[in-house]
């Protein structure tokens, strides 16, 4: 068949292990090809993997996510892409059991976005989809013939299931829309630049440190290994000679038991295998064997060139010469890693071409990424802000995102659940924030009475979850801005109603009437032990959105009867931007996060009548009467906001702020 010659190639995931070797090879060997690489720089990606290509005129790097349809469409059109080599994926099987939705998002949804962009632009002449041998499922131990390309797909874990699902989409777009697709399924790959979550680099780094090599189970599992440069050559052959609509296995019939791999690495380091190999608990999802038929690709002229001994020696030499390539990876070297540690540097030593990224920063994107253009004077840039926000579906969390958009601050919402430490670690590794905002938690719907009958759920979110996030942030040197509550106090003899004497930050909570307040007081006390937390005591939050049912104005304007009692309150339109400024100033400790002074519930409703609805009427009842229609008592108090006022002298009193931010903009003429 005729050889295919591309012009402009988009390689996704090209800062990762295999794709970086492919990109570097094509850039080096084909100077007439323009290579655009797209990578979101996940934990197992590293821009240094592309160092050999960074000065090449036919190379361009773009930081971004394949799940962003706007970005992908923009790249295809503006770069004139005619060929896509799609490597980007979550690939570590172990992680897929703890966070399979992330694998679905990256591996299936991300692939779907690419395919749809190809369909819409109508300019793609080749779409090479990179899959895995694991889609075939486990091979019988006594099988003499490997899985050929027409074999049934029987994935056994969430990772391989998402790769098989992505393949189905690729095949469907090929048949339904005539997209010129080719799929590859590869054996295990090893060599330089690989993140040490995989067996060979993990064992090499452990051996370099003189530590034992942990083997899951009895070590009889069999794998086939190919050296990275041989695999890069295989993709070069598939690119130029592969036939549209076909699948190609990239494999070898040479198999090795995990035991033998460990022994060979011990031999390279002159270590006694008997003393330095330790058998640990097996993984329940550790398939015994993957075996491929490799004849189809060989007919195109490819064959592996690097022997096992030669490849292993090259790999060992590279890791011993580059021990800090990935930074602190001690967490990945554990026998059963709970979650990987933060990898090392992400940037080239010199400046990067951010021209395209800077252009894209002006366009809407799903990742809220703002990439500043490079300075021309060569002075080092102050690290830009990037917030990780928990509580996306909540009122405060949603408002924080809008403020960040307005101020041009990069941010992402956390995907993990607060009580799931591993998912929080993955968020931090993925987002790499400068600050973390926590507005997540349980307040109860429609009100805090819900917490009285859902106590374990309330503890899980408000106590265990908040403490877990604080601890993870502390481990990573991150300031956590924690939105707490001032509903942990009630008027008492030292702070009588109407006295103007408010509760200070150092005062001990005295309100235990509701289970919600108990959990918030408990977690606030425990958070005092964390020096990386800024606790913001919010009370009866109010905003300019008078249609929001969580707005205190909206709440009481819909009540049949209202208790008339003065309280401290928080006007979010004024105070949420202040919380962002507090993060910039790295303020810590406890802060009464309310406007100075108090306002009674009747005064709020009087303003509502005067500004919004002249016909509005309401009735009052006593605390005793209120107690008959609610499950748990409510907190009423005055907070002393002098500490916040001293830090932000422009802070308005509660009544001034209500008029400026809530009632004034909504005034009915």
From Swiss-Prot:
The keyword Endoplasmic reticulum does not apply. Substrate binds at residue 132. It catalyses: UDP-alpha-D-glucose = UDP-4-dehydro-6-deoxy-alpha-D-glucose + H2O. Its cofactor is NAD(+); NADP(+). Gene3D superfamilies: NAD(P)-binding Rossmann-like Domain (3.40.50.720), UDP-galactose 4-epimerase, domain 1 (3.90.25.10). GO terms for cellular component: cytosol; mitochondrion; plasmodesma. Expressed in roots, stems, leaves, seedlings, inflorescence tips, and siliques. Detected in the adaxial side of cotyledons, in the emerging leaves and in trichomes. Also detected in the root tip, more precisely in the epidermal cells in the meristematic and elongation zone. Transmembrane segments: none annotated. NAD(+) binds at residues 13-19. Pathway: Carbohydrate biosynthesis. The keyword Lyase applies. One of its GO terms (biological process) is cell differentiation. The active site is at 133 (proton donor), 134 (proton acceptor), 159 (proton acceptor). Its main location: cytoplasm. Trifunctional enzyme involved in UDP-beta-L-rhamnose biosynthesis, a precursor of the primary cell wall components rhamnogalacturonan I (RG-I) and rhamnogalacturonan II (RG-II). Plays a major role in supplying UDP-rhamnose for flavonol biosynthesis. Catalyzes the dehydration of UDP-glucose to form UDP-4-dehydro-6-deoxy-D-glucose followed by the epimerization of the C3' and C5' positions of UDP-4-dehydro-6-deoxy-D-glucose to form UDP-4-keto-beta-L-rhamnose and the reduction of UDP-4-keto-beta-L-rhamnose to yield UDP-beta-L-rhamnose. In the N-terminal section; belongs to the NAD(P)-dependent epimerase/dehydratase family. dTDP-glucose dehydratase subfamily. The increased accumulation of auxin in rol1-2 seedlings appears to be caused by a flavonol-induced modification of auxin transport. In bacteria, TDP-L-rhamnose is formed by the successive action of three different enzymes on TDP-D-glucose. In plants, on the other hand, a single polypeptide probably catalyzes all three reactions that lead to the conversion of UDP-D-glucose to UDP-L-rhamnose. This is Trifunctional UDP-glucose 4,6-dehydratase/UDP-4-keto-6-deoxy-D-glucose 3,5-epimerase/UDP-4-keto-L-rhamnose-reductase RHM1. The gene is RHM1.
